[in-house]
Regions:
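Hydrophobic positions on the alpha1 helix immediately C-terminal to the Walker A/P-loop
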Residues: 18, 22
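N-terminal phosphate/diphosphate-binding loop that engages ATP/GTP or pyrophosphate donors
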Residues: 24-69
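Helix-adjacent hinge/juxtasegments
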Residues: 54-93
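P-loop (Walker A) phosphate-binding loop of NTP-binding proteins
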Residues: 10
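Short, surface-exposed amphipathic charged segments that create phosphate/polyanion-binding patches used
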Residues: 44-50, 160-169
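Long, low-complexity, compositionally biased intrinsically disordered regions
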Residues: 165-235
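Conserved glycine(s) of the Walker
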Residues: 14
């Protein structure tokens, strides 16, 4: 199911701030965010903070390790320790990661965690570096179960509203899929009994088309997401 949201953008575009605002809306959540660490107004490093409020230094200008990004030395042992605190979750937990970037990707354990989150049935949201890429990141971008959303200073307020709505649509799609009696299939047309009446979806060359207003504006909706997953399960 398309249930993973990746927020990308240039440094200081607001992607981490946006993720932090979104996860505040969820009570049951697992993951971590990365915070700046400053001293006398100067950024000297980054710390990881888990959903439980546990913190550990990820990188610092004064560390001496074999892993370095810009002037920051990365402590892989600290990172792996924090990963062990967020690698287990329940089926209804909301998953989040900030960020999938160069520092974190020094850790093989982090790569395993990313794939575990994305491969789960849980809704997952993560920030993704725009200034760094490697084969692992490019493979993530090619997945067919993600929404890749770019944030800029100009569009972040608009995208915040869109993301909040999209998350509700994904959650609704998951519920629809769990209730197969909602679906009635007739060749290239499908009827879905929704919470607000019946929606008719038609198959076109570019994929499934829905008549709802959200789809007309965004080319995606809970009905299309649900149908794609329903057909995958029942093919």
């Amino acid at each position: 199911m398309r249930k993973n949201i990746l927020i990308t953008g240039m440094p200081r575009s607001g992607k981490s701030t946006l993720l932090k605002k979104i996860i505040q809306q969820f009570d049951n959540k697992v993951g971590f965010v990365t915070n700046e660490v400053r001293k006398d107004g100067e950024r000297i490093g980054f710390e990881i903070e888990t959903n439980a409020g546990e913190k550990s230094m990820l990188a610092n200008v004064d560390f001496k390790t074999n892993f370095k990004v810009s002037r920051y030395f990365v402590d892989i042992e600290n990172l792996d320790l924090m990963i062990s605190k967020v690698e287990n979750f329940e089926k209804n937990d909301f998953l989040f990661l900030d960020e999938i970037g160069q520092m974190e990707l020094f850790s093989e354990k982090f790569k395993v965690l990313v794939e575990k989150y994305l491969d789960s049935t849980n809704i997952c949201i993560a920030t993704l570096s725009k200034i760094y890429s490697d084969e692992f990141i490019e493979d993530i971008k090619r997945r067919n179960d993600i929404f890749l959303i770019e944030i800029t200073e100009e569009n972040r307020d608009e995208k915040e509203k869109y993301l909040e709505t999209l998350l509700r649509k994904i959650a609704k799609a998951k519920r629809y899929v769990s209730e197969p009696d909602r679906f009635s299939i007739n060749q290239h047309e499908v009827c879905i009994r929704t919470d607000h009446g019946t929606r008719i979806l038609t198959e076109q060359k570019e994929g499934w088309i829905c008549s709802c207003e959200f789809f007309k504006e965004n080319k995606v909706c809970s009905h299309v997401i649900a149908l794609e997953e329903y057909l995958k399960i029942h093919e």
